[in-house]
Amino acid sequence: MTNTRKTHPLIKIINHSFIDLPAPSNISAWWNFGSLLGLCLAIQILTGLFLAMHYTSDTMTAFSSVTHICRDVNYGWLIRYMHANGASMFFICLFLHVGRGLYYGSYTYFETWNIGVILLFVVMATAFMGYVLPWGQMSFWGATVITNLLSAIPYIGTTLVEWIWGGFSVDKATLTRFFAFHFVLPFIIAALVMVHLLFLHETGSNNPSGLISDSDKIPFHPYYTIKDILGVLLLILALMILVLFSPDLLGDPDNYTPANPLSTPPHIKPEWYFLFAYAILRSIPNKLGGVLALVFSILILTLFPLLHVSKQRSMMFRPLSQCMFWFLVADLLTLTWIGGQPVEYPFITIGQLASILYFTIILLMLPIVSLFENKLLKW
């Protein structure tokens, strides 16, 4: 008799995706982040759902409703901090997942990669809107500064910003619509994840060597289910250490002050995971130029398949490209640090140099080094 999991119309989809899926036999721990991102999304949707039961999206009561959740709701503080720090874990996993894709040439799966870039944009938009909801000082001013960037668009900019605000400033209408979008977007993310996996399973997973592994596949279960469970336990451990020992480590103290349109905080900055893009935005004196650089800093990921000129897919056997990759990582860490610093000398200059270096490494240095390595192969 045939197994139910192989014949049942619904169960067989799950079976082909997570149980009998043929997987390369040599994928390393860097391939764990897909499942960890799925876990992060599940944690965020669940904790967010329970927070939404007690949160009110009104400028008068939003701040106090978050306080009420932390003080009066049973384990509300735990749910709130799991949600806030869960976002940080989400982005750590996202950055590592994208980094893995760049290092091992996974971007040659064109559709999977581009859906991934769209996912990155949507997750960033969701996180930004979520940061506005507690209605603290940094929520309000962050929303004001970032939405104001759209006014740099010629002709329609100002109208567009006022349309998004629902008035002439960030106010009740803005908060309500941000809450609505913040609630619905994670479900859109979940749908996009399905599409991401659909395209991935058309081709099969990449592996560290970058070589075709069709001749050497193993079933996903039990080998990689066990491996993923280890990753899950480590992620939950890290998240709970963060939540239970220093829940405000990655937050901004200014967000414990209720939003006040009449008082601007000395340093307006977003959450840590946006700082690299914020540094690129600030490094260009022109408003429109800054906005374009900000968008292109993420959109540039879509160019990687086109910029790939190497004879080899993965960087595993390309030491010069590896050097360039780690230069890029160091540069992104520098940008993250600069994004959190005040706009003064020497931070302005460092930020400008790091921004130029970011685009130069991706658009110029990596392809040149790859071509040089191709030449070395003929020696």
UniProtKB/Swiss-Prot annotation:
**Which InterPro entries does the entry mention?**
Cyt_b/b6_C, Cyt_b/b6_C_sf, Cyt_b/b6_N, Cytb/b6-like_sf, Cytochrome_b, Cytochrome_b_C_euk/bac, Cytochrome_b_N_euk/bac, Di-haem_cyt_TM
Q: Which cofactor does it need?
A: heme b
Report how it sits in the membrane: Multi-pass membrane protein
Instruction: Give the superkingdom in one word.
Output: Eukaryota
What detail does the entry give on cofactor binding?
Answer: Binds 2 heme b groups non-covalently.
Recorded hits in Pfam families, A to Z, give:
Cytochrom_B_C (PF00032), Cytochrome_B (PF00033)
Which residues are listed for heme b b566 binding in this entry? 97, 196
Q: Where in the cell is it found?
A: Mitochondrion inner membrane
Would the keyword Transcription regulation be found if you checked this record's keyword annotation?
no
Spell out the GO cellular component terms annotated for this protein, sorted alphabetically and separated by semicolons: mitochondrial inner membrane; respiratory chain complex III
Task: Write out the GO MF terms.
Answer: metal ion binding; ubiquinol-cytochrome-c reductase activity
Q: Which residues cross the membrane?
A: 33-53, 77-98, 113-133, 178-198, 226-246, 288-308, 320-340, 347-367
* One annotated GO biological process: mitochondrial electron transport, ubiquinol to cytochrome c
Name the residues that bind a ubiquinone: 201
Q: How does it assemble?
A: The cytochrome bc1 complex contains 11 subunits: 3 respiratory subunits (MT-CYB, CYC1 and UQCRFS1), 2 core proteins (UQCRC1 and UQCRC2) and 6 low-molecular weight proteins (UQCRH/QCR6, UQCRB/QCR7, UQCRQ/QCR8, UQCR10/QCR9, UQCR11/QCR10 and a cleavage product of UQCRFS1). This cytochrome bc1 complex then forms a dimer.
**What else is on record for this protein?**
Heme 1 (or BL or b562) is low-potential and absorbs at about 562 nm, and heme 2 (or BH or b566) is high-potential and absorbs at about 566 nm.
What role does it play? Component of the ubiquinol-cytochrome c reductase complex (complex III or cytochrome b-c1 complex) that is part of the mitochondrial respiratory chain. The b-c1 complex mediates electron transfer from ubiquinol to cytochrome c. Contributes to the generation of a proton gradient across the mitochondrial membrane that is then used for ATP synthesis.
Protein family membership: Belongs to the cytochrome b family.
Name the chain's protein: Cytochrome b
Q: Which organism is it from?
A: Cynomys gunnisoni
Which gene is transcribed and translated to give this protein?
A: MT-CYB
